[in-house]
Amino acid sequence: MVASSPHESDKGGGLFDDPTPELGLTGRPRRQIPEPPQLDRHGPATIVSMCNQKGGVGKTTSTINLGAALAEYGRRVLLVDLDPQGALSAGLGIPHDELDLTVFNLLVDPSTSILETIHRTAVSGLDLVPANIDLSAAEIQLVNEVGREQCLGRALRPVMGEYDYIIIDCQPSLGLLTVNALACSQGVIIPMECEYFSLRGLALLTDTVDKVRDRLNFNLEIIGILVTMFDRRTLHAREVMERVIEVFGDQVFDSVITRTVRFPETSVAGEPITTWAPTSEAAEQYRGVASEMVERLSK
């Protein structure tokens, strides 16, 4: 009987050992997400709401950059600004305060055609329905309307065949405008800043999604929770991430958006990170989100 050498015993089985997987920012094993396949035709659109009642969590930044990344992959994308602050419109360089026709007119005036409100952006394949402060009066005007929760869905119907995705940037509330978005969407993406108070609000939001699904839109599903503004250097962020994964599991996107000074720069420039800094880590992260969203919706 030949004794094994010390070097052989250190290998612990050698060839048959599973290699230690590389971990992603979520703490789960990193996986390769395939790029979306090329399309041979476009439409009908899948409508996605970017939704969180807490402000400052990266909804608008994520809407712009997810839309731009999808357009890079050959998708036709329409972004809808549903926030009276008009940050989505401004972030794409559209002078929204000067416009006569916006999403407000679509909601309150059935004679307004959506084709009159769509603006081309500087990104090929990416269009926008803008908003401005006029939208703040929409909920008051709609409150007594029959089918008031379906107004946005009716307005979008004529262009459903023209786009692959329609992404709605919701305002930071769970009022009638947000309910309109959820009522016409197939999916919801919930961006959340990686900090404790953002985590606390997720239960209320998921409860609202459940109520809309039960009462207005049986097809509504949560596509995923997108962690944004993650600072891997801080213990707090890592602890919150661990808790989010513990509570929501596979609902959390593998793709994580880290904190960077690049995003304020793109807001001033009026263009997405994918064109402003195409080789940056942030641009690659949003391409990952786009690939993962397409993958999840195809299941």
What residue spans do the PLM features occupy?
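P-loop NTP-binding core
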Residues: 1-299
